[in-house]
Amino acid sequence: MTPWTRRRFLGEASCSALSGVAVLNTLLNLKLAERASAQGAPNDYKTLVCLFLNGGNDSFNWLVPRDAGRHAVYATARGNLALGVGDLLALNQTPEGDGQLYGIHPSCAGLQELFNGLGGDAGKRRAAFVANVGTLIQPTTKAQYLAESVPLPRALFSHSDQIDQWQTSVPQGMSELTGWGGRAADVLHASANTGQTAMGISLAGNNLFQVGSTVRQFVITADGALTLAGANTDAASDPLNPLRLKNAAQKSLLEQHYAGLMAESFAQLTKTSLDAQEFFLSQFNSYDDSAVAGLFPGGNFLARQFRAAAKAIALRPQLGLKRQTLFLSYGGWDHHSE
């Protein structure tokens, strides 16, 4: 497929007077709004689970060519990090692969089963690779980079900026303050969801991916919703719990009206967050998670995140969610110290 030039994209979109960032956001939001308007309130449920690999996954040793010619090119480029053909887990050929042979890292047996349709998902291909994708504005050679003859992302090679670019889908600049998951929630949340829980739930702290112009992300942990220090949701129903008066005092302060706009906004935001936290935690703690406990065995950080995500998905009727994004993260994916 012939790559689109920036000029061609702007011209064919009839938006040549707009910047690249404005065009991107406008087109994506218009498309989402068009579909949401046409479909009305959805009757089905869909969620997007984003596992963000902090540090940069070494994808050159994840998906590797197995045919002799291309493997030789790969081995030359990787040096002593290269994997032998015999070490790779073979992937079945696909119509999209043009007959080329690939394998994956020997530690990824589960991914091989998902791709090839083996194991518990026999006959169902549940994994795909989207290759040659990055934060460049357009395909760029080393010579073009050195000559600065093509548009380049700002702060190229800066890990923190590239994280922002992945999560905003805007490589052209660092001024975009919303993520593409958040922009989707701006359009979809009000029409698809009825509960007080946010469409975007994060198990990895605050992130740019779920930040929207009008919506907020809801941050939880593997054990449920975050609470204020010393707060206890069980105290409200227990007259003998010493935290009951403390909780009541906190809510009373938040329900006051303040003259200052900042103080009033902070109080309202905090109260809304606490109400959402209490509701979510009551549902989360009362859910029988035996059905999801075996899906992600182990006590490691990633398994605990996935179990909590599975519980959040299972609670969708109680939370009033038909469209949802879940954000998880896992780090340590680089060779800087090796």
Residue map of PLM features:
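Feature for exported/extracytoplasmic and membrane-associated proteins, marking the mature portion
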Residues: M1-E338
